[in-house]
Swiss-Prot record:
Organism whose genome encodes this protein: Carboxydothermus hydrogenoformans (strain ATCC BAA-161 / DSM 6008 / Z-2901)
Taxonomic classification: Bacteria, Bacillati, Bacillota, Clostridia, Thermoanaerobacterales
Domain tr-type G: 6-188
Enzyme class: hydrolase
Topology class, membrane: Peripheral membrane protein
Listed InterPro entries: EF-4, EFG_III/V, EFG_V-like, EFTu-like_2, G_TR_CS, LepA_C_sf, LepA_CTD, LepA_IV
Protein name: Elongation factor 4
């Protein structure tokens, strides 16, 4: 009888968005009979309504499969599902740390994409055994030979044992399972050593508290044990231990090498950090597990409730989301224009959109968001360095020596006929050309250094539209560089509106200011007085538009007449003015705050 550990395989699936990762997971679950026919729905592991709707995987999930291999042994396969989108790289790296191997899924018609490559490099850092799987070979335009050659040339993997599969028709699924058993090594761990377990995810259950998803490296864990978190030394008693099928199923205990979950009455999310190491309180391990780094948010924006009495609800909702999402940060802030709200930090634009949608959908909140910002470094004349995530906090121009902005290294893969369009786009966005490499006769990999601020507006949309949807993008943060940046204020009726301030590059300031005031003129409703809208840098106004006044002579049709009649009309007019939601004296609709995002950034 082989040892328990030798029958365990922990693996994940790496793929670019839409290469069929979740469908492949469905087929593996179906083939091994982990779920009954009734429970099988498409994309079983994408349990969030939003994930199913957008067809993307956001949260990492896990499931335990039982597979009787051709060698007669029954193996336990732990599949840890990972997201493919660039914003969720931290989810991927945590899932990889819990595995010994990975299926590298590549679409037979699309070939290697930018994020496939990024995730492969992550997997190689974790020394994972990679099994190439060419998926979607049932498509009429599939070119498996070309894709296999790409995998060999670009990634340098031997594809002689690559598997051709179709997750849709179920072809090649058994070969995939056999390859997992044969080629992925079993976990190495010692049940006798003190407990060491990696938390790779968590979610909050209103009855049980925080449920931590863990991969045991050494030792064992059972209900009733006292455990300790190694980052903050907090102690808890385990109340429940279980595995994923993919629904949570309690078991008697977990041993080294296994993947499962624990509940320990943890009420505060901060005590259960993803990436932390759990150990036993009586017999603690000396060293925590390596490889966890605190994720830093890259994009910030303000979230404000439309009704000010929802402020507490918004705080509760953010606290709950943070339980599931280690990378979300938030702190309270106030704005003259919008009242009380929160400054939230996200990994990228998709992450921001999803959090916002979850707040509105799952918690029924009505929100106003301000324009997204990146974190700027401001070096003051006295040598002090400030990190600014909100343009309103920028010190006066006289105190600033220079401003530095974050840059990313962007890798763009694109068919050769669109290379010109994409290079134009990168130049418009102040990109610095680094490299261009032909992956095959008709696919090119471009590398640019770009300011992050230029990517977070609509770079991705533009990239897709200029390449007819064929380009794919991956980016990583490379550091700060000085730039000619200025703060642009928007004044409405002479009052600066803090929520509309943006930090822009000097060359684009006039153009952006011009566009923004024109857009605001369309969006701000006409009032009974003239409203000037100005864009200003410091005290210099660079663009101005005026919202014309509505006709206000309510007494014009009275021609003499009784004074009470005139009074009635004047009173009525007064009532109307009261009804306006005021900022200073002007009602600014929510669309106006979003206008900052929608400006065409191309000139």
């Amino acid at each position: 009888m082989p040892k328990r550990q030798e029958l365990i395989r922990n693996f994940c699936i790496i793929a670019h968005i839409d290469h069929g990762k979740s469908t492949l997971a469905d087929r593996l679950i179906e083939f091994t009979g982990a779920l009954s026919e009734r429970e099988l729905k498409e994309q079983v592991l994408d349990q969030m309504e939003l994930e199913r709707e957008r067809g993307i995987t956001i949260k990492a999930q896990a499931v335990k499969l039982t597979y009787k291999a051709k060698d007669g042994n029954t193996y336990y396969l732990n599949l840890i599902d990972t997201p493919g989108h660039v914003d969720f790289t931290y989810e991927v790296s945590r899932s990889l740390a819990a595995c010994e191997g990975a299926l590298l899924v590549v679409d037979a018609s699309q070939g290697i994409e930018a994020q496939t490559l990024a995730n492969v490099y992550l997997a190689m850092e974790h020394d994972l055994e990679l099994i190439p799987v060419v998926n979607k070979i049932d498509l009429p335009n599939a070119e498996p030979e070309r894709v296999l050659k790409e995998i060999e040339d670009v990634i340098g993997l031997d594809t002689s044992e690559a598997i051709l599969a179709s997750a849709k028709t179920g072809q090649g699924i058994e070969e995939v399972l056999e390859a997992i058993v044969k080629r992925i090594p079993p976990p190495r761990g010692d049940e006798e050593k003190p407990l060491k377990a990696l938390i790779f995810d968590s979610h909050y259950d209103p009855y049980k508290g925080v449920i931590a998803y863990i991969r045991l490296v050494d030792g064992f864990i059972k209900p009733g044990m006292k455990i300790k978190m190694m980052s903050n030394d907090k102690e808890f008693e385990v109340t429940e231990v279980g595995i994923f099928k993919p629904y949570l199923t309690p078991v008697e205990g977990l041993w080294a090498g296994e993947v499962g979950f624990i509940a320990a009455g943890i009420k505060n999310v901060r005590d259960c950090r993803v990436g932390d190491t759990i150990t036993s309180a009586e017999n603690p391990a000396k060293e925590p597990l390596p490889g966890y780094k605190q994720v830093k948010p890259m994009v910030f924006c303000g979230l404000y409730p439309v009704e000010s009495n929802q402020y507490e609800d918004l705080r509760d909702a953010l606290e709950k989301l943070k339980l599931n999402d280690a990378s979300l940060t938030f702190e309270p802030e106030t704005s003259v224009a919008l009242g009380f709200g929160f400054r939230c930090g996200f990994l990228g634009l998709l992450h921001m959109e999803i959090i916002q949608e979850r707040l509105e959908r799952e918690y029924g909140l009505n929100l106003i968001t301000t324009a997204p910002n990146v974190v700027y470094r401001v070096v003051q004349t006295n040598g002090e360095v400030l990190e600014i995530d909100n343009p309103a906090k920028l010190p006066p121009a006289g105190k600033i020596d220079h401003i530095e902005e974050p840059y990313v290294k962007a890798t763009i893969m694109v068919p050769k006929e669109f290379v010109g369009n994409i290079m134009d786009l990168c130049i418009e966005r102040r990109g610095v050309f680094i490299n261009m490499e032909y992956l095959s006769e008709n696919r090119v990999m471009l590398t640019y250094d770009l300011p992050l601020a230029e990517i977070i507006y609509d770079f991705f949309d533009q990239l897709k539209s200029r390449s007819k949807g064929y380009a794919s993008l991956d980016y990583e943060f490379i550091g700060y560089r000085p730039g000619d940046l200025v703060k642009m204020d928007i004044l409405i009726a002479g009052e600066p509106v803090d929520a509309l301030s943006i930090i822009v590059h000097e060359d684009k300031a006039y153009y952006r200011g011009r566009q923004l005031v024109e857009k605001l003129r369309e969006l701000i409703p006409r009032h009974l007085f003239e409203i000037p809208i100005q864009a200003a840098i410091g005290s210099r106004v660079i663009a101005r538009e005026t919202v014309k006044a509505l006709r206000k002579d309510v007494l014009a049709k009275c021609y003499g007449g009784d004074v009470t009649r005139k009074k009635k009309l004047l009173e009525k007019q007064k009532e109307g003015k009261k009804r306006m939601k005021q900022i200073g004296r002007v009602e600014i609709p929510q669309e106006a705050f979003m206008a900052v995002l929608k400006i065409d950034n191309n000139k």
